[in-house]
């Protein structure tokens, strides 16, 4: 259910400036999107798992605030990451 080290490393490599650039907004959004996708599948299989659903809603809210910040600071990068992650806005 959690993002493995290999998945995290590949996401950081794809979206970050370097392999250790985990603090960049793009990387944080991409990692949250991966976690959200995995938790969404988990919640579909286990509909009564309220704790996971609560965590999912929290992650979606955090990603939304990061996307708002990114839209304010770099509109072109924002549009690019929406296309790459297949997010709708």
Curated annotation (Swiss-Prot):
It holds the Pfam family Ribosomal_S15. GO terms for molecular function: rRNA binding; structural constituent of ribosome. Keywords: Ribonucleoprotein, Ribosomal protein, RNA-binding, rRNA-binding. One of its GO terms (biological process) is translation. The keyword Ribonucleoprotein applies. CDD domains: Ribosomal_S15p_S13e. Gene3D superfamilies: 6.10.250.3130, S15/NS1, RNA-binding. The keyword Hydrolase does not apply. It comes from the Bacteria. One of its GO terms (cellular component) is cytosolic small ribosomal subunit. Signal peptide: none annotated. HAMAP family: Ribosomal_uS15_B. Belongs to the universal ribosomal protein uS15 family. Part of the 30S ribosomal subunit. Forms a bridge to the 50S subunit in the 70S ribosome, contacting the 23S rRNA. One of the primary rRNA binding proteins, it binds directly to 16S rRNA where it helps nucleate assembly of the platform of the 30S subunit by binding and bridging several RNA helices of the 16S rRNA. This is Small ribosomal subunit protein uS15. The gene is rpsO.
């Amino acid at each position: 259910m959690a993002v493995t080290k290999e998945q995290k490393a590949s996401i950081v490599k794809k979206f970050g400036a370097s392999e250790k650039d985990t603090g960049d907004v793009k990387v944080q959004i991409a990692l949250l999107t991966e976690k959200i996708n995995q938790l969404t599948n988990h919640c579909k299989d286990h509909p009564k798992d309220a704790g996971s659903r609560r965590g999912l809603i929290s992650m979606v809210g955090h990603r939304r605030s990061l996307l708002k910040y990114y839209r304010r600071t770099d509109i072109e990068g924002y549009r690019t990451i929406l296309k790459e992650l297949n997010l709708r806005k």
